Swiss-Prot record:
GO MF annotations in UniProt: 2 iron, 2 sulfur cluster binding; 4 iron, 4 sulfur cluster binding; iron ion binding
Quaternary structure and partners: Homodimer.
Signal peptide location: none
Official protein name in the record: Iron-sulfur cluster insertion protein ErpA
Metal-binding listed as a keyword: yes
InterPro entries according to UniProt: FeS_biogenesis, FeS_cluster_insertion, FeS_cluster_insertion_CS, FeS_cluster_insertion_RrpA, HesB-like_dom_sf
Provenance organism: Edwardsiella ictaluri (strain 93-146)
Domain of life, source organism: Bacteria
Keyword Iron-sulfur: yes
A GO CC term attached to the entry: cytosol
GO biological process terms held by the UniProt record: iron-sulfur cluster assembly
Length: 114
C-alpha cells in the first residue's frame, strides 16, 4: 500500500528499517514481519511478533521502505488506529505497538486490555 492511502495500522520508518536489516541478516527476501494478538499476559491480551514468509487469506499487508508488515483480520480489529514501531533504549531493543484501543497496559507494554 502507498503511504498516501489511509491504512488502519501504521508501520513506522524505524520499524521498517529494522525489519529490512533483520531480513538481510536472514538472507530471505520473502520474510515479512507479522504482528498478532493472543490471549494472555497480565492484562488479558498480548502482542506477538514473528517473521513469516506467507500471507494468508484475510491478512492485511502494509508495505514500507520495501518491506512488509502482515496482520491477520482478527488481530487487526484490536489494532486499528495504532502503530508498530521499533525502539532502542535502556530497557533494550524491541518492536512495540502503540495502541489507542488499549484501556490498560502492563508495565512492559506487551500486554493490554480493551
Amino acid at each position: 500500500m502507498s503511504d498516501e492511502m489511509a491504512v488502519p495500522l501504521q508501520f513506522t520508518d524505524a520499524a521498517a528499517n529494522k525489519v529490512k536489516s533483520l531480513i538481510a541478516d536472514e538472507d530471505n527476501p520473502n520474510l515479512k514481519l507479522r504482528v498478532y494478538i493472543t490471549g494472555g499476559g497480565c492484562s488479558g491480551f498480548q502482542y506477538g511478533f514473528t517473521f513469516d514468509d506467507k500471507v494468508n487469506d484475510g491478512d492485511m499487508t502494509i508495505e514500507k521502505l520495501g518491506v512488509a508488515l502482515v496482520v491477520d483480520a482478527m488481530s487487526l480489529q484490536y489494532l486499528v488506529g495504532g502503530s508498530v514501531d521499533y525502539t532502542e533504549g535502556l530497557e533494550g531493543s524491541r518492536f512495540i505497538v502503540n495502541n489507542p484501543n488499549a484501556k490498560t497496559t502492563c508495565g512492559c507494554g506487551s500486554s493490554f486490555s480493551i
